[in-house]
Amino acid sequence: MPSRTSANLILASQSAYRQAQLRQLGLPFTTAAAYINEEVLTGENAQQTAVRLAKTKTLKIAKEHANDYIIGCDQTAGLDDIILGKPGTEENAFNQLMQCQARTVTFYSALCVYSPENKQLIQHCTQTKVSFRELNESQIRSYIQRESPLDCAGSFKCEGLGISLFESIQSDDPSALIGLPLIALCTALQHTPFQPI
């Protein structure tokens, strides 16, 4: 294991979900909000958007903390050629879940880690295919009322009741669907002072 350092590990996110995930690794870290424009660019697909936003968040925090390790991440969801964002309202969540029911949605969980040692970025994007059950309007409204997934891409929380919406999940990293791909993160942190084991 590399020796400890005076550098900090900073998660470029205020997401309680991602913070809880990072805590699983038992690493000391702080958070910093990376307020950026998260609009989708013309011609950009869901994966490109997630990768770009994760990198932009990382670089924004790295400008202020050039001697620290920075973890940036972003997640988007794609249904055919439609990018599903955070719904923000119950009606938008309802419409998203109606679109998703009985279909497969691909989630892109992008990770970008900045290393102060060599000023390099390590980037990764994990795909997760989620097949939704057939759902009726009543089931969808009940779910939204019970879990209020208004701040989640795709309008569900897979770590909670949202799992009941699914028929199956396919991914190389089961943690990615929550928002922070921990397997890729552990790989990125190898040979750093923040190697988990």
UniProtKB/Swiss-Prot annotation:
Nucleoside triphosphate pyrophosphatase that hydrolyzes 7-methyl-GTP (m(7)GTP). May have a dual role in cell division arrest and in preventing the incorporation of modified nucleotides into cellular nucleic acids. The record marks 17, 75, 159 as: Important for substrate specificity. Keywords: Cytoplasm, Hydrolase, Nucleotide metabolism. One of its GO terms (biological process) is nucleotide metabolic process. Belongs to the Maf family. YceF subfamily. The keyword Ribonucleoprotein does not apply. This is 7-methyl-GTP pyrophosphatase. One of its GO terms (molecular function) is nucleoside triphosphate diphosphatase activity. GO terms for cellular component: cytoplasm. It comes from Saccharophagus degradans (strain 2-40 / ATCC 43961 / DSM 17024). SUPFAM superfamilies: ITPase-like. Disulfide bonds: none annotated. The active site is at 74 (proton acceptor). The lineage of its organism: Bacteria, Pseudomonadati, Pseudomonadota, Gammaproteobacteria, Cellvibrionales. InterPro entries: ITPase-like_fam, Maf-like. Its cofactor is a divalent metal cation. The keyword Cytoplasm applies. PANTHER family: 7-METHYL-GTP PYROPHOSPHATASE (PTHR43213:SF10), BIFUNCTIONAL DTTP/UTP PYROPHOSPHATASE/METHYLTRANSFERASE PROTEIN-RELATED (PTHR43213). HAMAP family: Maf. CDD domains: Maf (cd00555). It catalyses: N(7)-methyl-GTP + H2O = N(7)-methyl-GMP + diphosphate + H(+). It is found in: Cytoplasm. Signal peptide: none annotated.
